Design a protein with these regions (language model features):
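Nucleic-acid endo/exonuclease domains
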Residues: 1-113, 117-168
Length: 168
């Protein structure tokens, strides 16, 4: 049984934001402080990613554990009321997220998901540093140059030729 009336529950649920959430702001503030520049909620990309780093061809989704059904997380507990509705809703969200990641991948974009529980104070710094490391890794991997080894017939050093010239 819900402790709130329908009207109270409606007001409570309506107040939940989808943009500029605290976890999203934490990630954005960290990225900006480390020199990463980004766009928000890009309308032309599938799923309107929370953060888009064009230079890295990477998008970041900052997901709430409850709303996106984070497996094995304390924050993801199905409500006791109307469980069928919530189970279907969260399952649809998961499927939609998976489809969006696949579409982005087929378009050549990397997608990273940061979960709300990964931004709790005890693990926040580790998560953000791992995110930074991942972005640098993506950048370097995407820009790898193929190096061709050439076989030199005679390897000589400049210093050798100078010393030989001075002897004569």
């Amino acid at each position: 049984m819900d402790k709130m009336t329908k009207e109270q529950r409606h007001r409570c649920m309506s107040a939940i934001k989808s943009k500029n959430t605290k976890p999203e702001l934490l990630v954005r503030k960290f990225l900006f402080s480390r020199g990463f520049r980004y766009r928000l909620n890009h309308p032309r990309l599938p799923g309107h990613p929370d953060i888009v780093l064009r230079k890295y061809r990477t998008v970041i989704f900052v997901n709430g554990c409850f709303w996106h059904g984070h497996e094995n997380c304390k924050s993801y507990v199905l409500p006791k009321n109307n469980t069928g509705f919530w189970k279907n809703k969260i399952e649809r969200n998961r499927n939609r997220d998976m489809e969006e990641h696949q579409k982005l991948s087929s378009m050549g974009w990397h997608s990273i998901t940061v979960w709300e529980c990964q931004l709790k104070p005890k693990v926040r710094q580790h998560t953000l540093e791992a995110l930074e490391h991942t972005l640098y890794h993506i950048y370097l991997e995407d820009r790898k140059r193929i190096s061709y080894k050439t076989i030199e017939e005679e390897s000589s050093m400049v210093a050798e030729s100078l010393t030989e010239d001075t002897k004569n």
